[in-house]
Amino acid sequence: MADAPKEGRLTRFLDFTQLTDMASESVGGKILFATDDFFAPAENLIKSDSPCFKEREYTEFGKWMDGWETRRKRIPGHDWCVLRLGIQGVIRAFDVDVSYFTGDYAPRMSIQAANLEEEKLPEIPERGIRTGAAATPEEFEAIAELKSDDWSYLVPMTELKPGNPASGHNYFLVNSQQRWTHIRLNIFPDGGIARLRVLGTGQKDWTATDPKEHADLVAIAFGGVCVGFSSAKFGHPNNIIGVGGAKSMADGWETARRLDRPPILENDDNGILLVPGCEWAVFRLAHPGVITRIEIDTKYFKGNAPDSCKVDGCVLTTQEEEDMIKQKWILPAHKWKPLLPVTKLSPNQSHLFDSLTLELQDVITHARLTIVPDGGVSRLRLRGFPSSICLLRPREKPMMKFSVGFKANP
């Protein structure tokens, strides 16, 4: 998930909580090429954590900096790098972060992009350890096959300011609905940039999807996104639809402890806690479809997993979603259809729920995960078939039937 702009200049145009950093190393972003990495390698641009400064830290090549920093150029040209997005899709904005680069920041930059077919890409040499090095003639020859000079400009050449707290972040809106896979960052003529955040939403090519294979319809890499939640004290719900498995408890969704819990807790006859409150998160699916398998993973949440959960689904238009966001998701009960009834959860465990009868499932556009009374979840997977396939199936019953299985995490 993307952090909100610190200066607040774009908050009236974009809801940054609905965007993800498509270039981050945490989602599979990768630096393919850089003209120079003398002081600090370009891989630092796509680190998921915020840049830091170590006043007394030096390397054999000079001052240690948490970003990409090239040598002072003494030959014709300018520096640039190429990266492959970990999440490919629609770019809404860039954050060019020059934090801590106050006397050696890149004075100007521009950004280009391309939509390339993976199977047609040339072989690019692995970069390895780059500090103190410049690109070799062989690397220049390989990257030239991408013809990145001709890529579309999403940000023209623009001046940057020093990386002081008030001017470190430089935000640029992108007015394009095109799908992008690769980025070229140009700096003029040289210097340093701490981070490049490519903010947007994933976009899967559903026409290329095998209709016989399940797809995770809520995956952030395909375009799924959290559009509402009750609490996100220790982690945003977008984390639980992230790429791959959770890396730690910080990589999940965790709420604050509810204060309306009874002084003494009791269970019902099914072993479910009797409490008045709950927490919830609503997700827009990457593609409308039928859900046939649900996975709820509480890995790493050993003393703070929810007691129970349920999952509901509904069909909403874009306008209805906008209205619900304004109303904080106070949605009439009849709109939600149960996908998974109230179910007991266990700590640090993956819980699998498989549909018994696909033909009886309904198409949904949104899903709501409710946890009781509070706690944390590391991953949510909603696997099924996109609506272009499942709309051809009978839809007699709204209720989905599940068999419950548990797969313990090590």
From Swiss-Prot:
One of its GO terms (molecular function) is allantoicase activity. The gene is ALLC. Transmembrane segments: none annotated. It comes from the Eukaryota. The function of this enzyme is unclear as allantoicase activity is not known to exist in mammals. Pfam families: Allantoicase (PF03561). This is Probable inactive allantoicase. Belongs to the allantoicase family. One of its GO terms (biological process) is allantoin catabolic process. It comes from Macaca fascicularis. InterPro entries: Allantoicase (IPR005164), Allantoicase_dom (IPR015908), Galactose-bd-like_sf (IPR008979).
